[in-house]
Amino acid sequence: MGFFSSTQPPRPATVPSDEIIPLHFWNTALCMRGTVLDISLKFDDVLDTSKLRSALEELLEMKDWRQLGARLRMNPNGRLEYHIPTRFDASRPAFAMTNAQHETSIADHPLGARIPHATSTPAIFPSPDVLSPLLRSEDAPKNIDDWICSDRPQLSIHIITFSDATLITVTWLHTLTDVMGMALILNAWTALLRGNREAVPKLQGFRLDPLTELGQRTPAEKYMHFNRVFGRKEFWWFIGLNVLDRLWYRQEERRTICIPAASLRNLCQQSSSEICASRGKEEPVPFVSESDVLLGWWVRSLYSALGLRTDQTILVNNALNLRTSLHESFTSNNSAYMGNALCMSPTFLRGHQVADEPLGQIALRIRESVTEQRTPEQVEAMTALQMQTMEQTGYLALVGDPRMMLLSCSNWHKARLFDIDFSSAVLQSSGPSSLQNPQHTGKPCYVNGVQHSANSFRNVLSVIGKDAGGNWWLTGVLRTDAWTHIEKQLHKLGSS
């Protein structure tokens, strides 16, 4: 059963001694309630599970961090609350941790051998979901009912050890935090593994939410795309067209992509040359990031793969991290924001632009659009708009036109998951990168990301990040027939 089920199991009684904190509006959106996230880290090292447990126990006993051990409840009014135990013990632990131990090499395990690895040419791998029987424990939560109808803590961690590798999977409901917030948890965990308590920041986001103040500074009407915000008619028109698309193209797949460092370097050089060619000799060359170039390549590939029209609006929605957009609103030198702190930054393109313009120009359009929308005034106006829409509908606001093609991107690379350092828990290293460069010891060589939801993630791209070798990892969900074209584009990229 899930959030939209008509019947639910009985819910546990309230523990009188628990501290009760209502969830803030940003974390209660229907899309947050309906999504469970898994992040799995693969290490070419054997890690000490007892050290991992002890450090995480220490973290969740620290004053502000105890809130992560809260139980999720829904009150009689249908509102979500955190119930924080006064103390954690074996009957009510701060987190759930399970272990599976294999005495063999990970290469000898039928699923372990299928974990993607870096390649010399662009490659596409099966859905990351196929690894779930290995990466998740049997009782790992899959929907909101698994929290509100039990006394389960917010974090579920499953650790799988082999003779030459370790896998760590963290599972949580999106109401708790986004991927950037999970990176804060992982980095605080590893800081305590090193014995560095001073590196653990204080947490904001549970009792007081700076997003509420952020949404009251600037009126929503000052948002640059306010005149394109969907009303009720446009919203249901857009939903109806998307339902028809899913009825016509019923099959969809999530796949993992590896873009080798050399291939992306060629794409970036191509983009830079194209941007330079379009400007005068005296004009400075504008900045575009590797992520901009990757997203531009993805949009161009989907234009053909999905059979889009030249006159069609294509909305590229980039997830904008509010933590970095407005530093003074969220963090001081010793504090960090825990929760969902995202706005979508739309870039409007026309089909003919994607078809006719060079890759560099598309990447530049994406970069310029993001830059325009991350000013304090625009972020504040976007936040005000989302607050108003959430209060009225429970949904996040949409902009554009109902007939547009919506392509969304979540850039996990900003969380630097491949840089998280568990080296203080390493018992034995076996990976080639660790042997060649000790700085890679205890850092993930692969990151697996999966969203569990009754909702479709079609046309959503997650940029997982860049590994130690400079290779980029992506996961995307597309209708099944579109992946054939993506494979051709990857082959073309590898041949250039």
UniProtKB/Swiss-Prot annotation:
Q: In which pathway does it act?
A: Secondary metabolite biosynthesis; terpenoid biosynthesis
Give the enzyme's EC designation: 2.3.1.-
Which key words are in the record? Acyltransferase, Transferase
Q: Which residues participate directly in catalysis?
A: 174 (proton acceptor), 421 (proton acceptor)
Mutant lacking the gene: phenotype: Drastically reduces the production of andrastin A.
- Superkingdom per UniProt: Eukaryota
The GO terms describing molecular function are: acyltransferase activity
- InterPro entries to which the protein is assigned, alphabetical: CAT-like_dom_sf, Sec_Metabolite_Acyltrans
Q: Which GO terms describe its biological process?
A: terpenoid biosynthetic process
Q: What's this protein's family per the entry?
A: Belongs to the plant acyltransferase family.
Q: Which PANTHER family match?
A: FAMILY REGULATORY PROTEIN, PUTATIVE (AFU_ORTHOLOGUE AFUA_3G14730)-RELATED
Role, per record: Acetyltransferase; part of the gene cluster that mediates the biosynthesis of andrastins, meroterpenoid compounds that exhibit inhibitory activity against ras farnesyltransferase, suggesting that they could be promising leads for antitumor agents. The first step of the pathway is the synthesis of 3,5-dimethylorsellinic acid (DMOA) by the polyketide synthase adrD via condensation of one acetyl-CoA starter unit with 3 malonyl-CoA units and 2 methylations. DMAO is then converted to farnesyl-DMAO by the prenyltransferase adrG.
Quaternary assembly: Monomer.
Provide the protein name. Acetyltransferase adrJ
Q: Which gene encodes it?
A: adrJ
